[in-house]
């Protein structure tokens, strides 16, 4: 899982699951083709569309020094009907 950082669980991403669309944050340097190839290879699914947007890092302040966190990219991956990605969360006991 080089390119994908983690799966996003927001109200919008949960709503998109009904349309067979999965939302995840990926490395900002990753391209759509890399992520599409990786998802198809790793999960054995067929990707028909990908939407992405770049999110700015949040501002951070440490005393007089002002900085920011890293930028990242969010991908919305649409799969062909009949395919699905299994949940990536493991239950902790």
UniProtKB/Swiss-Prot annotation:
InterPro entries in the cross-refs: Nucleotide-bd_a/b_plait_sf, Ribosomal_uL23-like, Ribosomal_uL23/eL15/eS24_sf, Ribosomal_uL23_CS
Keyword Plastid set for record: yes
GO molecular function, one term: structural constituent of ribosome
Main location: plastid
Record keywords: Chloroplast, Plastid, Ribonucleoprotein, Ribosomal protein, RNA-binding, rRNA-binding
Record's GO cellular component terms: chloroplast; ribonucleoprotein complex; ribosome
GO BP annotations, alphabetical order: translation
Protein's cellular compartments: Plastid, Chloroplast
Superkingdom, taxonomy of origin: Eukaryota
Protein family (similarity comment): Belongs to the universal ribosomal protein uL23 family.
Subunit and partners: Part of the 50S ribosomal subunit.
Function: Binds to 23S rRNA.
Record-given protein name: Large ribosomal subunit protein uL23cz/uL23cy
Organism: Piper cenocladum
Organism classification: Eukaryota, Viridiplantae, Streptophyta, Embryophyta, Tracheophyta
């Amino acid at each position: 899982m080089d390119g994908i950082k983690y799966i996003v669980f927001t109200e919008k991403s949960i709503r998109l699951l009904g349309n067979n669309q999965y939302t995840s944050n990926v490395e900002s340097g990753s391209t759509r083709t890399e992520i599409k190839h990786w998802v198809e290879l790793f999960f054995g699914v067929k990707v028909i569309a990908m939407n992405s947007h770049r999110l700015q890092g949040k501002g951070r302040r440490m005393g007089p020094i002002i900085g920011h966190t890293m930028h990242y990219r969010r991908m919305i991956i649409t799969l062909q009907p009949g395919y699905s990605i299994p949940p990536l969360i493991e239950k902790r006991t």
